[in-house]
Every structure is written in structure tokens, then in C-alpha cells.
């Protein structure tokens, strides 16, 4: 399977035959700006997406995370549009061990507790560019939470790379 985040819509494709991919389903999100990246929960039941341009275009007022239910691949259902607390343009997110690690450009990395995958809750953040605010495309670009040590890498376009580790029992 291939899960495509294609700007204005979400597409699920069967790519068994690489020369002839078949569309299984296409779904659209309300007020889409530019949806381009997402990540599956470990059980593959939910797909989390960020929209990079919805805030810049004025479609929403804070960072929006889309949560799709993939129980029926022929009919994915948008079950939540989680709204963050900051007016941050979102870029990339990755899920690991019940948390979503989001690169939110000028507001750094935000961490969501997704132990209840249909109802995310903000759990923490690290601001890579405290001198920048508002929507825009500078600051935290991506995260990598997959080191066995628990260290999380956050890359920031102007500031470089940050290696972070949460405090014990912080969230």
C-alpha cells in the first residue's frame, strides 16, 4: 500500500503491481492548504497528517493535525482535526510509542500524547527558534524519534540540529 498526502487530498493506493498502481480510495480534508506528509500508528488503524499551508492561507488559526480512521481502506474517515495551541505552520510528524513528534516550523517540535489515538493531547514542546513567531517556513523542519536511546533529533532550517531527551516521567 501507498498512502499519499497529495496537497488537497488523501489517497490510498495498491502498489502491488508497480507498473500499474490502483487507487483504493481518495478522501479530502476540509480547508486543505498543502497536505504532504503523514505517519501510521503502530497498529496501522490511524493515519496522522499535517497540513503545511492551511495556517498560512488563513484556513485555520492554530496548527491542525488530521487523524484518519483506516479501518476501511475503501472509505477512510477523518475522525479528528486536532487543533494545537500555537499558530505554527506544520511540516513533518512521526509517531512512536504513543507520541506524535511534530516539526512545527517557527514554534519548534511539539509532542502529542496519542495513547487515545482519536483524541490527541499536547504533552510538550521544544522551541528551536524562540525569536520567531507566527506562520511561516523557517525553524523546525523535521524530527526523528526512532533512536533506541530515546533521543529525539530535531532539525531546524537556520539553527541546525538538536538532540533531545525527555526528562524521566515528564510526559
Model-found features: residue ranges?
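Feature marking well-ordered beta-strand scaffolds used for ligand recognition
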Residues: 1-171
Amino acid at each position: 500500500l501507498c498512502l499519499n498526502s497529495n496537497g488537497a487530498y488523501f489517497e490510498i493506493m495498491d502498489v502491488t503491481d508497480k507498473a500499474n498502481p490502483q487507487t483504493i480510495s481518495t478522501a479530502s480534508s476540509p480547508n486543505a492548504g498543502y497536505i504532504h506528509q503523514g505517519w501510521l500508528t503502530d497498529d496501522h488503524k490511524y493515519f496522522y497528517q499535517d497540513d503545511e499551508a492551511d495556517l498560512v492561507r488563513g484556513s485555520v488559526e492554530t496548527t491542525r493535525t488530521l487523524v484518519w480512521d483506516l479501518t476501511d481502506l475503501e472509505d477512510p474517515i477523518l475522525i479528528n482535526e486536532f487543533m494545537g495551541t500555537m499558530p505554527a505552520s506544520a511540516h513533518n510528524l512521526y509517531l512512536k510509542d504513543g507520541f506524535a513528534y511534530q516539526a512545527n516550523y517557527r514554534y519548534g517540535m511539539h509532542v502529542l500524547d496519542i495513547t487515545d489515538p482519536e483524541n490527541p493531547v499536547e504533552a510538550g514542546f521544544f522551541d528551536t527558534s524562540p525569536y520567531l513567531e507566527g506562520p511561516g517556513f523557517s525553524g523546525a523542519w523535521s524530527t526523528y524519534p526512532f533512536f533506541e536511546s530515546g533521543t529525539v533529533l530535531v532539525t531546524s532550517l537556520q539553527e541546525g540540529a538538536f538532540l533531545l531527551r525527555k526528562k524521566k516521567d515528564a510526559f
